Structures are given as C-alpha cells and as structure tokens.
C-alpha cells in the first residue's frame, strides 16, 4: 500500500532517458543535490511500436538498465522502472509524490519525442513542476543561432565532466515492479 507521508515530503525525479550512466551525467549530478530523489526509467509502450525498435535494441537497453541499477546500488539507491505510457506514469507519480523538479538530459528529437515532450511540458507546468534538461551532447536543440554554434561547441567541449553524484538520497517507489525487460522479446513487448 502506498504511504501518504510521501505527499508531505518534497521530491525530485531523475528521469533516465538515453543517459543510462552514473558518471559524467550532469542531470544525475544536479538531481543528487536534492534530498528525496526518485531515479526512474520509463519504457514507453508507444515507443515500442516505433519501427526503430528491435530485439537488439531491447537487449542493449536491458543490459544498460541492469548496469545502471548495479551502479545506483553502490550509491545506496535503486532504479525505479515503469512500463506504460510516459504521460500516464508521470501523472501517477504526481498523485503519489509532491514533485518539485524533474531532471533529465536532452534527447535528440524525432517526431515521437517532439510530441511526447510537448505533452509533458503542458503536464509539468500544470502541476507546477520544473523540468531541468541538461545538455549531454553539446548540440543545440533549442534556440539555435547558427553564428553561435562554434562558440557554444567549444564551450561545451571544454567544460568539466561530472563525477559521481553527491549527497544522494535515492528513494524507491514500492509500487513499481523493478523488473527489467530481460528475456522478453520484441514481439512480447508490443
């Protein structure tokens, strides 16, 4: 059963997207500065329907998630794994936790991610949640000014790397399965 004390405590979320690593992960580093951080990964059921998804992709994803979880355990944490529509997962999390900030790294945006992020922006704003997206590639995805590309790239490539997260207080959502996609084929996931 869900514990109502979580509606009193303030939480941040570290949303792992394609950045399934501990070291040199600015979003994870920044999220670790806040108490009560919920590290999550969402396997979006609509994403599985895209033509770019395959058994190879799911196997790689599973291996990466297992490795990430092992590394989070070394920090006294655990990855909270959800399977469903990303929008619905966040709505459920907002009902269970008093979320103040969501941290993630930017992702390259195909049509699926453009629409997803647009819908999530609306949801996050309506819930008064700040979404902090860090740049993990040095590529400008927003506010692109061609004359500034070189300078911005030099600034990014000369910036410091981020080490292990600090002061981590990672939370476990007892309602999520924490079972990864191991031994499931692509056909079973669709």
Task: Show where each model-derived region lies.
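Short, Lys/Arg-enriched N-terminal segments with co-localized hydrophobic residues
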Residues: 1-8
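Active-site "lid/cap" and pocket-lining segments within catalytic core domains
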Residues: 9-190
């Amino acid at each position: 059963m869900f514990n109502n004390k979580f509606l009193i405590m303030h939480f941040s979320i570290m949303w792992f997207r394609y950045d399934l690593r501990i070291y040199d992960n600015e979003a994870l580093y920044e999220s670790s500065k806040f108490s009560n951080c919920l590290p999550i990964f969402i396997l979006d059921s609509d994403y599985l329907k895209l033509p770019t998804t395959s058994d190879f992709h799911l196997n790689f994803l599973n291996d990466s998630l297992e490795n990430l979880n092992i590394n989070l355990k070394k920090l006294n944490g655990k990855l909270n794994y959800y399977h469903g529509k990303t929008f619905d997962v966040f709505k459920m999390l907002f009902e269970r936790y008093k979320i103040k900030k969501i941290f993630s790294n930017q992702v390259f945006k195909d049509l699926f991610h453009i629409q997803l992020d647009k819908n999530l922006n609306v949801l996050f704003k309506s819930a008064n949640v700040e979404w902090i997206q860090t740049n993990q590639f040095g590529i400008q995805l927003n506010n692109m000014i061609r004359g500034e590309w070189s300078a911005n790239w030099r600034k990014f490539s000369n910036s410091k790397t981020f080490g292990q997260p600090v002061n981590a207080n990672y939370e476990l959502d007892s309602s999520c399965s924490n079972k990864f996609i191991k031994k499931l084929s692509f056909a079973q996931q669709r």
